[in-house]
C-alpha cells in the first residue's frame, strides 16, 4: 500500500475506467458493479475536550449550491481528502477523540471526490418537501413493519431516522447529532428506537380482536455506545462542502438481533433499476408511522443524488437503497447507496427549482464507513 499525493482526480478516473465491470449481466438484470476500492486507515488519535451538547437538533439541512455549482469545483487534494475523511468519535461518557486517517490504494485504483464552493447565490428555502400529489405510503401492520426491508428503519431520539447496516451499527445523517460546530442536545444519551407490537402477544387486546384499526406499535430503545462523524461535515460547514459529508455511524451498546441492510458503493444513476431510489423514514407529519417512498433520480454529482421524493423533516438520515442482481451469489440484493440529507433550493438555468438531496456512498466513503463497522480493511474490499 502506498499513499498517492497530489490531486485525487487521477484516482477518480482510474476508478471510472477500470474500477467497475459492465453494469448488466443480462438486459433484464441490473447488476451491482464490482469496484476496486481504496483503503482508509487510522494514523493517529487525539483526545479532545468534552463538548457542551448545546446545539438544537435540526431535522433538515439546506444548501443553495446545486448540481452545476457542485460539478464546477475542483477535486480536493490528497491532503484535503484526508482531512475530510478524518473523524470524531463521541463516547457514551461524553469523552471524544479525533482520528487522522491515511488513504491507500490497492491494485492501482482508487477514488476522488468533488466538493462545492460557497460562491453560488441561491434563493431562500421553501418550507415544503412534497412535490405535487403526496406519493408517500404509511406502512401499517407488524407483518410489514417487522419484516425486511422496512424493519431496518429505526428512529433516533433526536428525531431523525437511521438504518441498520450491521449487527450493532446504524447509519444516519451527521446533522441529526452534530450541527457542524458541536453536538446536539441529547446526543450524549442518544438512543435508537425499534418498532415492536404494543402487546406482548402481538394482538390488539381482548376487546379489540375484530378492530379494523392498524395494530398498535411502540418503540423499544437501545442506548448508543459511540458515534463517528467525518471531519468533512464539521470542517465543511465553513466552506459549504459539508452536505457532501452529511453522514454518521452509531454503534449500539448491544446487538439489535434484526436483519440489516449492507452498504454499497452508489452506482451512476443511469445504472439504477428504472433510475429510481427507495427509502423509508419517520416523517414528523405522520407521528409514529414509518413512511415509504420511491422516485426517480433527477440529477447527480459525484457526492450527491438530486431527487424529488416526497419527504418531511424527520426522514433525514434514512438509508437510500436499491435492489440489484449480485452476480457472485446469483441473487437479488438490496444495499444502502446513500443517506437522505435534506432539501436544496437550486437555480436551474435561471429558473428556481427545489430538490431533496441524498449523500452518495462513494468508494472512499464506503471504505471509511466499512472500516468503522468492521475494524479491518481486509473485510472492506467489496463494495
Curated annotation (Swiss-Prot):
- The disulfide bonds in this chain are 160-176
Signal peptide stretch:
1-19
Q: Which residues are glycosylated?
A: 93, 207
- Active site (UniProt): 175 (charge relay system), 240 (charge relay system), 316 (charge relay system)
What does the UniProt entry say about where the protein is found? Secreted
Q: Which GO terms describe its molecular function?
A: serine-type endopeptidase activity
- Keyword annotations from UniProtKB, A to Z: Disulfide bond, Glycoprotein, Hydrolase, Phosphoprotein, Protease, Secreted, Serine protease, Signal
Instruction: Give EC number(s), comma-separated.
Output: 3.4.21.-
PTM Phosphoserine: list the residues: 109
State the gene name recorded for this protein.
Answer: PRSS23
Q: Which SUPFAM superfamilies match?
A: Trypsin-like serine proteases (SSF50494)
Alphabetical list of Pfam families matching this protein: Trypsin
The name on file for this protein is Serine protease 23
> What Gene Ontology cellular component terms go with this record?
endoplasmic reticulum lumen; extracellular exosome; nucleus
- Per the similarity annotation, which family is this? Belongs to the peptidase S1 family.
Q: Name one GO biological process term.
A: proteolysis
Amino acid at each position: 500500500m502506498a499513499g498517492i499525493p497530489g490531486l485525487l482526480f487521477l484516482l477518480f478516473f482510474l476508478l471510472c475506467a477500470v474500477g467497475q465491470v459492465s453494469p448488466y449481466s443480462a438486459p433484464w438484470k441490473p447488476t451491482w458493479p464490482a469496484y476496486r476500492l481504496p483503503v482508509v486507515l487510522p494514523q493517529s488519535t487525539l483526545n479532545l475536550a468534552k463538548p457542551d451538547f448545546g446545539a438544537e437538533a435540526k431535522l433538515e439541512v439546506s444548501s443553495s449550491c446545486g448540481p452545476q455549482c457542485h460539478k464546477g469545483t475542483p477535486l480536493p487534494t490528497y491532503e484535503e481528502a484526508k482531512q475530510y475523511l478524518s473523524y470524531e468519535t463521541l463516547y457514551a461518557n461524553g469523552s471524544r477523540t479525533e482520528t487522522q486517517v491515511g488513504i491507500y490504494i490497492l491494485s492501482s485504483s482508487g477514488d476522488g471526490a468533488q466538493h462545492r464552493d460557497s460562491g453560488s447565490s441561491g434563493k431562500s428555502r421553501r418550507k415544503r418537501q412534497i412535490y405535487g400529489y403526496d406519493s408517500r405510503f404509511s406502512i401499517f401492520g407488524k407483518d410489514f413493519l417487522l419484516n425486511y426491508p422496512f424493519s431496518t428503519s429505526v428512529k433516533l431520539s433526536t428525531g431523525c431516522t437511521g438504518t441498520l447496516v450491521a449487527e450493532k451499527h446504524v447509519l444516519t445523517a451527521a446533522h441529526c447529532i452534530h450541527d457542524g460546530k458541536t453536538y446536539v442536545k441529547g446526543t450524549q444519551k442518544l438512543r435508537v428506537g425499534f418498532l415492536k407490537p404494543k402487546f406482548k402477544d402481538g394482538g390488539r387486546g381482548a376487546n379489540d380482536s375484530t378492530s379494523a384499526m392498524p395494530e398498535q406499535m411502540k418503540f423499544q430503545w437501545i442506548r448508543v455506545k459511540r458515534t463517528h462523524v467525518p471531519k468533512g461535515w464539521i470542517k465543511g460547514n465553513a466552506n459549504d462542502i459539508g452536505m457532501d459529508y452529511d453522514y454518521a455511524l452509531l454503534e449500539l451498546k448491544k446487538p439489535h438481533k434484526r436483519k440489516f441492510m449492507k452498504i454499497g458503493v452508489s452506482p451512476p444513476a443511469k445504472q439504477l433499476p428504472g433510475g429510481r431510489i427507495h427509502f423509508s423514514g419517520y416523517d414528523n407529519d405522520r407521528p409514529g408511522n414509518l413512511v415509504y417512498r420511491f422516485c426517480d433520480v433527477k440529477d447527480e454529482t459525484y457526492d450527491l443524488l438530486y431527487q424529488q421524493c416526497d419527504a418531511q423533516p424527520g426522514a433525514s438520515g434514512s438509508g437510500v437503497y436499491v435492489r440489484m442482481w449480485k452476480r457472485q451469489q446469483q441473487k437479488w440484493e438490496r444495499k444502502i447507496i446513500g443517506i437522505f440529507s435534506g432539501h436544496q433550493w437550486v437555480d436551474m438555468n435561471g429558473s428556481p427549482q427545489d430538490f431533496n438531496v441524498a449523500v452518495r456512498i462513494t468508494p472512499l466513503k464506503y471504505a471509511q464507513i466499512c472500516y468503522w463497522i468492521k475494524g479491518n480493511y481486509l473485510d472492506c474490499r467489496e463494495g
